[in-house]
Amino acid sequence: MNRIKKGDTVVVISGKNKNKSGVVIQVNPKEQTALVEGVNKIKRHQKKDQTHEQSGIIEKEAPIRLCKLALVDPKGKDKGKATKVKYLLKDNKKVRVARKSGSELDVNKK
């Protein structure tokens, strides 16, 4: 079960990008990877053609494994730090909750 979703703010907990944070752009549950804005940047040499308007060296985000990411706690004394996620039933719906502060994670998302 994926605990990280598109639009979440996450922090990298291991690897060369440790302690960098960003917003999740895309999640691929089958491959257990995610694209995070501003994290794990790579450079690609790209030729101009019909599909690519820009040519030269392009810097873009590469996928990063979900096991290296942790959600950022939105509220409480641990605001901005990594937290685990638990699920609670609220009005017969599953709600994601930060373990450290107990605050809901899906409040303003659609």
Swiss-Prot record:
One of its GO terms (biological process) is translation. Keywords: Ribonucleoprotein, Ribosomal protein, RNA-binding, rRNA-binding. One of its GO terms (molecular function) is rRNA binding. Gene3D superfamilies: 2.30.30.30. One of its GO terms (cellular component) is ribonucleoprotein complex. Coiled coil: none annotated. Pfam families: KOW, ribosomal_L24. Part of the 50S ribosomal subunit. One of two assembly initiator proteins, it binds directly to the 5'-end of the 23S rRNA, where it nucleates assembly of the 50S subunit. Belongs to the universal ribosomal protein uL24 family. This is Large ribosomal subunit protein uL24. It comes from Ureaplasma parvum serovar 3 (strain ATCC 700970).
